[in-house]
Amino acid sequence: MKNNIILFAVATLALNSCGIYKKYEPVATLPENLYREEIAPADTFSIGNISWRDLFTDPALQSLIERGLANNTDLRIAHLKVQEAEAALMTSRLSYLPSLSLDPQGTTSSFDKAKASWTYNVPVSASWEVDIFGRLTNAKRQAKAALSQSQAYSQAVQTQLIANIANLYYTLLMLDRQYEITTETAVKWQESLRTTQALMAAGMTTEAAVSQTEATCYSIETSVKDLEQTIRETENTLAVLLGETPQDIERGRLEDQSLTPDLAIGIPVQMLSNRPDVRSAEYALAQAFYGTASARSNFYPSLRLSGSAGWTNSAGSYIVNPGKLLLSAVGSITQPLFNKGANIAQLKIAKAQQEEAKLTFQQTVLNAGKEVNDALTQAQTAKGKIDLRTHQIESLEDAVRSTQLLMTHGNTTYLEVLTAQQTLLSAQLSQVTDRFDELQATVNLYQALGGGRH
């Protein structure tokens, strides 16, 4: 008896050393220098922990996000994937319990016209696999990791959805403002056209100048039509993202938007714990880890206990009434012999899949760092450009007024006026784009740090 206990203990240690029962250990280290030196974090706060309602305070945008969270088809599919994973986990947990079956049978027979005899069996059978070699345990752990992955994926879809809705909303506001500027410019150019025609009538300019002004007016009016089309297309895209049919989108104004949180990014470990896609990739790695352990357990025998209990009136060649209680119990051990090659192949596949999952996780972390760096660079660049663009527009407005005055008195050419006005329009449109870039950078940083989870 003592020798058997020692043998069992040695076998258990051997199995543990093979990794059959070993639990997955979460990745605790990240690549060094995940952030560039000029944007390295100085504290542990991260805007990724802010609720999306606290970040996006525009009531119209909040309403759109709520509609998207309720109706977006991709997010609803992700929620269904979570339900599927929950059911799979329940199945793996139930595999620890014995399986029960009821198999009643009855037979009537008569030999040589003798009186018919009736026999019956009413057994209840039970079968239970004893999880000595970790097959069921690893299957349950793998299913649990799959559930966690599906939950993280659902959160990643939600984060992406909120960011996409916000970016499309701000795109609409940018287009609205550019439409206003271009429309106002078209009106001013019509005035310039009338002025140029009057100057030509007075002999102070040429017909070529009038033709050039007309061409510029048509060009600006064409830009207005292009902006109208782009606005409609963007509205349609946003409506589909909300899970709704194309429609007009109620919205505010670009000038009224304010996203001014402290753009703190937190330490890399925080970012890792916040981003749902990173968590999803790590849970996929855990799944692959337990898949490898399951493949190893296939090399070991399986122990199954089975038994039955019930009533029968058939006792061999005798029939007794009333029936008697019948009990039976069987224990069996099945050791794979001829499918070892298949098991080896499955283990190689599992190891390769685990390595693939590891590389995918590493790449996901690198992508996360890149997205944070890109968003911060975009925010810093946009802020600097806005300040410079303001001074540029002030100078261009002075230049337009000066050249128009000079042309009225015949002291400059029409080309200088045309150039100044076109440059001013371009700068005004670029200023709107810079403001959009600043808003988009905050949205992208919020998403990159795992924001939108709550």
Enumerate the language-model features and the residues they cover.
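Sec-dependent bacterial lipoprotein signal peptides
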Residues: 1-16
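Sec/SRP-type N-terminal targeting helices
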Residues: 76-77, 93-94, 130-158, 208, ...
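Short terminal targeting/anchoring segments
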Residues: 208, 411-433
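A small-residue-enriched
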Residues: 18-36, 66-131, 233-249, 262, ...
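Regulatory alphaC helix of protein kinase catalytic domains
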Residues: 39-67
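A short glycine-centered flexible hinge/capping loop motif at secondary-structure junctions
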Residues: 200-204, 407-411, 448-452
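Periplasmic alpha-helical coiled-coil/stalk elements that build and connect Gram-negative outer-membrane
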Residues: 145, 152-267, 378, 382, ...
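Acidic, low-complexity, intrinsically disordered peripheral segments
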Residues: 7, 19, 23, 259, ...
